[in-house]
Structure formats: structure tokens, C-alpha cells
Amino acid sequence: GMKDYFKKLLQKVIKKIKSFRKKQD
């Protein structure tokens, strides 16, 4: 359902932010 879709989308965004922060350091 929609909740599953948003959970997956949120996880993708979190992974991108984490990898982006690693590149910054």
C-alpha cells in the first residue's frame, strides 16, 4: 500500500543523505 511505498522512499532518501554526508567528511 501507500505506507509501504513511502517507507521505501524514505529509506532511499536516508541512504542518499548518509552517503552524501560521508562524502562531505
From Swiss-Prot:
Domain of life of the organism in this record? Eukaryota
Which compartments does it reside in? Answer: Secreted
* Keyword set includes Secreted: yes
UniProt entry keywords in alphabetical sequence: Antimicrobial, Cytolysis, Secreted, Toxin
Q: GO molecular function, one example?
A: toxin activity
Q: Show the GO cellular component annotation of the record.
A: extracellular region
GO biological process terms, alphabetically, are: killing of cells of another organism
Tissue specificity statement from the Swiss-Prot or TrEMBL entry: Expressed by the venom gland.
Please give the function described in this protein's UniProt entry.
Answer: May have cytolytic and antimicrobial activity.
Q: What is this protein called in UniProt? A: Oxyopinin-3c
What is the phylogenetic placement of the source species in the record?
Eukaryota, Metazoa, Ecdysozoa, Arthropoda, Chelicerata
